[in-house]
Amino acid sequence: MSAQKAPKWYPSEDVAALKKTRKAARPQKLRASLVPGTVLILLAGRFRGKRVVYLKHLEDNTLLISGPFKVNGVPLRRVNARYVIATSTKVSVEGVNVEKFNVEYFAKEKLTKKEKKEANLFPEQQNKEIKAERVEDQKVVDKALIAEIKKTPLLKQYLSASFSLKNGDKPHMLKF
């Protein structure tokens, strides 16, 4: 005979109690070389090989960068820090206001279920319309960045030139 009385009701299948997770969201530690104003080389994506200016670290652990668009065609966008090489070239970004740029600014608009169904029924290839607000923001940032870039001779040409490796180049021996 058992020392304790069996319960009147018990589940038909034993359900294991979930263990409490000890994981916590911690902010990402950026490399010491990633400081706002640093010129970066993009390694992947549509703009690979382009030199861009790093503006700000965003909450979702991405970097806010800009070409500037007028110089090399790279718009304001987010980039994962893994896909950049920091160079020793710096640009002053004191005159650039980047307060309004956050994760929500770059978030895609969510479609309702009805809109999704309609889009699936009649698929049409159309170019995405860029909001006028985005274009204005790009112009404001470009104006401030280009003013700083003009202060350094040949920096505009440096940013507009693409980076690539030639035969015999040893990337681990290069000093960026």
From Swiss-Prot:
Residues recorded with modification Phosphoserine: S12
Processing and modification events after translation: N-terminally acetylated by acetyltransferase NatA.
GO biological process, one term: cytoplasmic translation
Major place of residence: cytoplasm
Gene Ontology CC: one annotated term: cytosol
MF GO annotations: RNA binding; structural constituent of ribosome
Residues with PTM N-acetylserine: S2
CDD domains xref list: KOW_RPL6
UniProt KW Heme keyword: no
Crosslink (Glycyl lysine isopeptide (Lys-Gly) (interchain with G-Cter in ubiquitin)) position: K128
Cellular localisation: Cytoplasm
Keyword vocabulary terms for this entry: Acetylation, Cytoplasm, Isopeptide bond, Phosphoprotein, Ribonucleoprotein, Ribosomal protein, Ubl conjugation
Additional facts recorded: Present with 37100 molecules/cell in log phase SD medium.
Membership in a protein family: Belongs to the eukaryotic ribosomal protein eL6 family.
Role: Component of the ribosome, a large ribonucleoprotein complex responsible for the synthesis of proteins in the cell. The small ribosomal subunit (SSU) binds messenger RNAs (mRNAs) and translates the encoded message by selecting cognate aminoacyl-transfer RNA (tRNA) molecules. The large subunit (LSU) contains the ribosomal catalytic site termed the peptidyl transferase center (PTC), which catalyzes the formation of peptide bonds, thereby polymerizing the amino acids delivered by tRNAs into a polypeptide chain.
Subunit structure, interactors included: Component of the large ribosomal subunit (LSU). Mature yeast ribosomes consist of a small (40S) and a large (60S) subunit. The 40S small subunit contains 1 molecule of ribosomal RNA (18S rRNA) and 33 different proteins (encoded by 57 genes). The large 60S subunit contains 3 rRNA molecules (25S, 5.8S and 5S rRNA) and 46 different proteins (encoded by 81 genes).
Protein's UniProt name: Large ribosomal subunit protein eL6A
Source taxonomy: Eukaryota, Fungi, Dikarya, Ascomycota, Saccharomycotina
